[in-house]
């Protein structure tokens, strides 16, 4: 096949066999967010490039190496969004919905784009669900976000496979003091740092902390600790968060090297990680960004949020075999009709059933075919039952209900009793 007729490397088709699990995951998350009082916002996938340079930071890996940036016909520099927070902040500023201290609890879903090396769990087009809260500056809202994700993991059956890591980055002033101390220490050990860490030391020193290079990790054992440079405000905030997580019974570990890859974070940062997906172990991450709105031209506004990677979480559900049986099965009932008169009757009959059982997944055979071929398609569909409507059934105004998964013998059911019968054996279990 011509390369131009193939998907771009790292940008994947999500095929019909995969979409039921995606819809299950997305539906579970959206219902949970609704229950917690969060409202959905939808932003464009393309923004002015300067938005991400100002928010994420010009010397971050995302801006320097990973963004899909192009000039449009007007000569404007545009970028496919690499993350959602900056675009959400731009939207709330543009429409003034956080003015006057209005609290906004928002969520969004959609594709993000980064030109990274594709591998399991990491793609160039990937999908995220993000949550952002504005004008709440206490540790209680930080805790709510974490408690909410903890509840989600329970709903999905993956709590035992994820671990919460926490850290506090302090205020910008505390972070600047720590940065100076870290640069001084690392500069004295420059020849022991890997090449990438030497580059980061000049551009974004805190990113050296999350290096995977063994020799650099050995140097960092004796490096200054961020916790020793925290201001009282940040320390009190962090203690308040931990107290709330303890009260909620949510286990966590303090990771002093957790800094996140975006410049706008302050105070709380957190990650949910798993050891089930290899190198790409972060499934959800976030933190506070109290200075970002002001940095982008707005008034000082507290902000906190997180994003979760849908591909990784779907992969985790599959790895742990946490795929509900009804999700794996896309059809509940498959109707086989034999003869033109039966096909006409089947159309009216199935629409009556749909009126009474709107959640029933009922598929009608299309394209005619012999009894054997239709029954084969019914079995292949994964349906629990086949409905059989032929000349004899048509004359008697009955329909055959044949179990396909070992639930007993075939029964003949009167047309006017079909909905009630299916409700008892399919919809209710």
UniProtKB/Swiss-Prot annotation:
* InterPro entries on file: aa-tRNA-synth_II, aa-tRNA-synth_II/BPL/LPL, Anticodon-bd, Anticodon-bd_dom_sf, His-tRNA-ligase, HisRS-like_core, HisRS/HisZ
Q: Where in the cell is it found?
A: Cytoplasm
According to its UniProt record, the EC number is: 6.1.1.21
The uppermost taxa in this organism's lineage are: Bacteria, Pseudomonadati, Pseudomonadota, Gammaproteobacteria, Pseudomonadales
Keyword terms of this UniProt record = Aminoacyl-tRNA synthetase, ATP-binding, Cytoplasm, Ligase, Nucleotide-binding, Protein biosynthesis
User: Which family, according to the similarity comment?
Assistant: Belongs to the class-II aminoacyl-tRNA synthetase family.
The disulfide bonds in this chain are none
Its subunit composition reads: Homodimer.
Query: What GO CC annotations are associated with the protein?
Result: cytoplasm
Q: What is this protein called?
A: Histidine--tRNA ligase
Principal subcellular localisation of the protein: cytoplasm
Its GO biological process terms?
histidyl-tRNA aminoacylation
* Gene name, Swiss-Prot/TrEMBL: hisS
